[in-house]
Amino acid sequence: SRTLFLITALTVISLSNIYSQPEIKAVFTGKAPVIDGFVNDDVWANAAVINELYQKEPKTGEPISEKTEFLFLFDHNNIYVGIRCYDDPKGIIAKELARDVSLGEDDRIQVIFDTYLDGRSGYWFQLGPRGSIGDALINENGKYFNKAWDGIWNGKAKITSEGWEGELIIPYKTMGFNKSSDTWGLKCIRYVKRKSETATWPATSINADKFQVSDEGKLTGLTGMTQGIGLDLIPYITGGFSKKKDADAAPVIDLGMDAYYQITPSLKVALTVNTDFAQTEVDAKQINLTRFSLYFPEKRDFFLDGSNYFTFGINGDDDDIKNTSM
């Protein structure tokens, strides 16, 4: 029984070490790396490095089968993420190039920043080997995933002789955060498609939700960050001509603007004047032969920004806000 107790104790200690919430301290840089997809600038040599990812599947808890490195730098205006995904170049699966497309059939990495360290919400960023990028808002500990959100950031990736690598530059102004705190929640994920392998930092359980935030690690040392005045202005102007029968053509000009002001880290005011919906993606046409209304996902940016704060209750698991077509 003493031997059994010792084995049990060692197992518990081992599992607690694997599933603990580790910390990594971000490194400030006075020189920004060039975002070209190659993680070869000298500044990356001083970056904070995460290289211990653990499989969620297929072999839960075991180290990732392919060497992987996530590197973190920051300055006063941006946070930078470098990625090195070592692999056989012939085995890399990378088909997509466009933004915000599904990379479910590609190799890819994902980074989640829980900027308020609440263990429930976060900003999700994705990068594929050929440079396809995607982003989303996470709420309700991964149950709410709003991929219609488009942040202001950029990412590049390249396939190399040793695998593939990439770089992200994310301005602080694209994310809300508490300036009085120097710590964010952080989760790093790599998918190796041909092996059906998912690996994360920190380690997570097989039963964890796909975008779960509560099992995150911590990114510390984030000081001296600038959010600016927190004011975003998005003006627009459209022009054309209008001609009526038996009348000369007359010019037509239409003006409008959306404005967003971040009063506090958790309070934002939105104002719209003569809202422009011309750039909004058109809903797919559907023929409705029933007596029930059709529901379409909300795609207008003005109504999407901050919408996750109004998602709760029975409908809290829905992926998108819905508007109704009568």
Question: At which residue positions do the language-model features occur?
Answer:
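Bacterial N-terminal signal peptides
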Residues: 5-14
